Every structure is written in structure tokens, then in C-alpha cells.
UniProtKB/Swiss-Prot annotation:
Highest taxon of the lineage: Eukaryota
GO cellular component: cytoplasm; cytosol; mitochondrion; myelin sheath; nucleus
Name under which the protein is recorded: Peroxiredoxin-1
Modified sites of kind Phosphoserine: 32
Induction: By oxidative and sulfhydryl-reactive agents.
Oligomeric form and interacting partners: Homodimer; disulfide-linked, upon oxidation. 5 homodimers assemble to form a ring-like decamer. Interacts with GDPD5; forms a mixed-disulfide with GDPD5. Interacts with SESN1 and SESN2. Interacts with FAM107A.
Pfam families, A to Z: 1-cysPrx_C (PF10417), AhpC-TSA (PF00578)
Additional comment: The active site is a conserved redox-active cysteine residue, the peroxidatic cysteine (C(P)), which makes the nucleophilic attack on the peroxide substrate. The peroxide oxidizes the C(P)-SH to cysteine sulfenic acid (C(P)-SOH), which then reacts with another cysteine residue, the resolving cysteine (C(R)), to form a disulfide bridge. The disulfide is subsequently reduced by an appropriate electron donor to complete the catalytic cycle. In this typical 2-Cys peroxiredoxin, C(R) is provided by the other dimeric subunit to form an intersubunit disulfide.
């Protein structure tokens, strides 16, 4: 796995790449154009594979939930944008994606995967890296799965909600936090309010 330039608490590496957009058109997009929004940027190994369509469709199906959080989801792999389009145009029952609600970018030179530290150099593909980038372009969360295991969209939504809550309120979110749950005031004395309720 490449070391990359993606570091928590620092600006996420910018990229410019050709994407297949939800309307089926090709468009050059860059990370910087999403400043002011949260971004969930995820890599997957290859088009026309097995775990990948389950993840991509799961993110696409819930694009509106992310939109309500002022969050854009973007997928990426090393395949060409033509390959992405062919996969989108393949019916789901034949292992295709069907219509998409999120852009899929093409990284054929592997530079974006390299920058984000997810390149599996011996195979020239990317691991299942996922990056949560805040509305100021700062990288807030990184997870990288090995190839055989997909990711949970529920958990990604929860993390976006938690980071947005801490941004707004300055309190911190305990393990398993969900909207409406108790949070912790990051202060030795004030935190006791939370801990005193624990069994």
C-alpha cells in the first residue's frame, strides 16, 4: 500500500479527474469545487467485480440522505470513464450498476489512489479506502479495507452526522453516538455530567 499524502486534520489532497455524472455525461470535476460541503470520497478496486457493485449501489441509493447533510458522495477506481459508463449501462441483474445518483471518477494513472495512500501497487488497483472531508476541505476520517470486505453506509452517515455535530456544538461524541444521543463536554468537570449517567 502506498504511503500517500492524506493526513487527518490536514487539507485533503486535491484532484481533478473525469467523472461519469448521474446524468450519464462525462465531466471533469475537482475536489476543490465541493468546498462548503462535506465529501465522502471512496475508492473501490475495479468495475465489473463482485463486492464493488453492492457498495456503490448502496451509496447511490442513499445519495439523498447525504445531500440532506450537505454532503457529496464521490466514488473512484482506476478504470476509465468509458468502463464506468459501460458498467452503469449494464443491468443490476447482470452485475451492473444501473442508473447512478453519485459521480464515479476515473483514475487510470493511479495518481489519486497514490495521493490518498490506497494504491495496491502490485496489482495496480486501489484498496477500499474511504475519506470523510469536511466543508473546509480538511480530512476528518480515513478507513481502508482489504479487498474482500465491503463498507457500511449506515456507519458513514453516522460519522458525517457526528463530525458535523462536533463542528457546530463543540461537544464530543462517544462510541456509537447517534443524533439525539448524549454527547460529552470536553472538560474535566463538565464531562462528569455525561459519565454520571452511565451504568
Amino acid at each position: 500500500m502506498s504511503s500517500g499524502n492524506a493526513k487527518i486534520g490536514y487539507p485533503a489532497p486535491n484532484f481533478k479527474a473525469t467523472a461519469v455524472m448521474p446524468d450519464g455525461q462525462f465531466k471533469d470535476i475537482s475536489l476543490s469545487e465541493y468546498k462548503g460541503k462535506y465529501v465522502v470520497f471512496f475508492f473501490y478496486p475495479l468495475d465489473f467485480t463482485f463486492v464493488c457493485p453492492t457498495e456503490i449501489i448502496a451509496f447511490s441509493d442513499r445519495a439523498d440522505e447525504f445531500k440532506k447533510l450537505n454532503c457529496q458522495v464521490i466514488g473512484a477506481s482506476v478504470d476509465s470513464h468509458f468502463c464506468h459508463l459501460a458498467w452503469i449501462n449494464t443491468p443490476k441483474k447482470q452485475g451492473g450498476l444501473g442508473p447512478m445518483n453519485i459521480p464515479l471518477i476515473s483514475d487510470p494513472k493511479r495518481t489519486i489512489a497514490q495521493d490518498y495512500g490506497v494504491l495496491k501497487a502490485d496489482e495496480g488497483i486501489s484498496f477500499r479506502g474511504l475519506f470523510i472531508i469536511d466543508d473546509k476541505g480538511i480530512l476528518r476520517q480515513i478507513t481502508i479495507n482489504d479487498l474482500p470486505v465491503g463498507r457500511s453506509v449506515d456507519e458513514i452517515i453516522r460519522l458525517v452526522q457526528a463530525f458535523q455535530f462536533t463542528d457546530k456544538h463543540g461537544e464530543v461524541c462517544p462510541a456509537g453516538w447517534k443524533p439525539g444521543s448524549d454527547t460529552i463536554k470536553p472538560d474535566v468537570n463538565k464531562s462528569k455530567e455525561y459519565f454520571s449517567k452511565q451504568k
